[in-house]
Amino acid sequence: MARKSLIQREKKRQKLEQKYHLMRRSSKKEISKVPSLSDKWEIHGKLQSPPRNSAPTRLHRRCFSTGRPRANYRDFGLSGHILREMVHACLLPGATRSSW
């Protein structure tokens, strides 16, 4: 299980990303519309003003139950080994084990 501080840090990043999302999106649209290079540099400077952790690339998906950062399935929000355990225990509706 991941440390609680890492999980809380990720939640803080998600809140920051939601807070600055509209500002980033509008600035990016502005950059594409402005023809002069000097204006683009000014807008680019505005894009760098919010905190680093507000960037969507800083987000990392984590397992819903354990907080594990690797091997996550987007459809379920679980890591691979937890997903396998839950499917074997019939806790996920619609998920079946393959057999051939």
Curated annotation (Swiss-Prot):
UniProt KW keywords: Chloroplast, Plastid, Ribonucleoprotein, Ribosomal protein, RNA-binding, rRNA-binding
Ribosomal protein as UniProt keyword: yes
Location(s) in or outside the cell: Plastid, Chloroplast
GO CC, any one term: ribosome
GO biological process, one term: translation
An example Gene Ontology molecular-function term: structural constituent of ribosome
Family classification: Belongs to the universal ribosomal protein uS14 family.
Subunit structure: Part of the 30S ribosomal subunit.
PANTHER family: 30S RIBOSOMAL PROTEIN S14 (PTHR19836), SMALL RIBOSOMAL SUBUNIT PROTEIN US14M (PTHR19836:SF19)
Record's function text: Binds 16S rRNA, required for the assembly of 30S particles.
Protein name, entry field: Small ribosomal subunit protein uS14c
Organism: Manihot esculenta (Cassava)
Gene that specifies this protein: rps14
